[in-house]
UniProtKB/Swiss-Prot annotation:
PROSITE patterns: G_ENGA (PS51712). GTPase that plays an essential role in the late steps of ribosome biogenesis. This is GTPase Der. Residues 444-473 are annotated as: Disordered. One of its GO terms (molecular function) is ATP hydrolysis activity.
Amino acid sequence: MTPVIALVGRPNVGKSTLFNQMTRSRDALVADFPGLTRDRKYGEGNYEGQKFIVIDTGGLTGDEAGIDAEMARQSMQAVEEADIVLFLVDGRAGLTAGDEMIADYLRKSGKQAHLVVNKTDGQDPDVAAADFYSLGFESTFLIAAAHNRGILSLLEALLPEPENPEDQDRADRYPGIRIGVVGRPNVGKSTLVNRMLGEDRVVVYDMPGTTRDSVYIPYERQGHEYTLIDTAGVRRRKNVREAVEKFSIIKTLQAIDDAHVVILVIDAREGLVDQDLHLIGFVLDAGRSLVIAINKWDGMDPEDRDRVKEQVARRLDFLDYADKYYISALHGTGVGTMYESVQACYESAMSKWPTNRLTAILQDAVAQHQPPMVHGRRIKLRYAHQGGSNPPVVVVHGNQVDSLPGAYKRYLENTFRKVLKVVGAPIRFEFKSGENPFATKVDRLTPRQKVKKDNDLKKGRRIKKTRQKSVKR
């Protein structure tokens, strides 16, 4: 299971800076969902192959009834979701009453909490941390998040050893195509999951799982095996009525990561909103195949339907490769037709292509539209081969590929997608420059070249002497 790390502490102690360092990017996989996860940001990190999720909170003042009680509630919710809690304090400001109250709350929570003294740069770290030892935490780490000091040691000490392959690949133990159904609260995820399962009269039963674990439900349909990854908490058929869901980013990230194909459910009556785009960003960053289901299509006026279709076409024009379905999960309209896209997405994501075919596509693309010139030299793309699947990765070798414009990369992606007939799945490209085979060789002249060089030098000396004599005269 992916470890979840929560960062808590007073405002402005460096939580967001540490968050950015742990996710290794200021625009890493980050979501900020107003109203649902206010003042909580979620990101993914990776340390030596060990993935983890980081939750950044807005800050605790130590007083739950303070100016922003909602901020305190969200921070406490992050603590409940986490496996590991990092309690950040400011080494420059020293120990405060707010720090003491937060420490007391963490002790009562029973969570695995560690003290992290930040902003220790420019002073003696031991002196900066001295006051905080009185808080009584078993482990204390000294870091300078702004300068990325001490963070790798922190991760090395806290993250568990990689799980054994049997546990690590638990998703692989489930048969067939794994389908993750994700979406905002109350868009109809539970209804859709039960409709998909109910089409073959599969009995849905309670399965064990914690508050942040997705539920894996294997089933068969028309001779094909599938596993639905449920983030909405589907239970017995008698409890199918859509209630207010508890939205969990943790479940969503887990479902996307484990899935072969992701079905994103959008509420047609509310239209496409920013939170939907955030979720699409999660799917694209994970490189998963995508099918979009616009739900609650029944009972809408023709004018409203046209408006929604226009909005989807305009705001999702960058997803022209993903199939879009207008469905009613409640009545089952259009649900069965999605399986055709699910199957096509899976086949595209798991495809294997020979090197000679990929190279031929590359050469044809270059012949039709050559790469631009850089410093008077044409960028050359020599050959291509496959570097992975789910998502499909195409590795292109050439020279000066670092200078290849984004527009040309998109041209290559569209060309490969069209020729290979890839549906629903993103194609990732990696560009590698070929090394110069003569770079490490000593420049040795042949005997003939040596004679020519000597003659040129002698000729140059004679010309120089002649010019000097002319100047003296």
